[in-house]
Amino acid sequence: VRCGIQADIVEEGTTTMPVRRLSSIVRELPDAAIEISVDDSDVATLDCGSSFFKIVGLSAEEFPVVSSPEDKFCYQLDQGTFSEMLQRTAYAASTDETRYVLNGVLLSFKEAKLTMVATDGRRLALIENEVDFPDEAASEMILPSKAVQELIHVLGDEGELRIYSKENQIIFEFGNV
């Protein structure tokens, strides 16, 4: 998940930090400005009021490269519609680790419609919605259950959702996320 926020940047740079640790710290901080500084060994220091934390991160070069959305096919939908489609299919996805190919929701962009399908071998959920996209953008992909649940959690009820896909990567872009 990549999210943009307003910040006063003194010196540009990149690093990575464990998201669970960072979010649990930020969640408990008072509603005030947070100052983040990172040293050469990727140790981040967070200052907020009287609170002070250090988080050991990794170099950004060790993080997997996510290509930019511009070189991918783009599908545009309403966030609420996409979220509802996910909710109506996610329940049927398998949780059996030995059947990993069923541990998600199939997204099929074909014939001017988006079809979502999930099954655990006993239950089957299918939902379709018309979507405009060029014929060369037709594709299918399995969205892992964990990603499905995260999208259901963060998507809003309204607003535009842009889905970029190419080969084995998919990017969901909405608002500042």
Name the predicted role of every residue range:
Residues V1-V177:
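Structural preference for solvent-exposed beta-strand-turn elements
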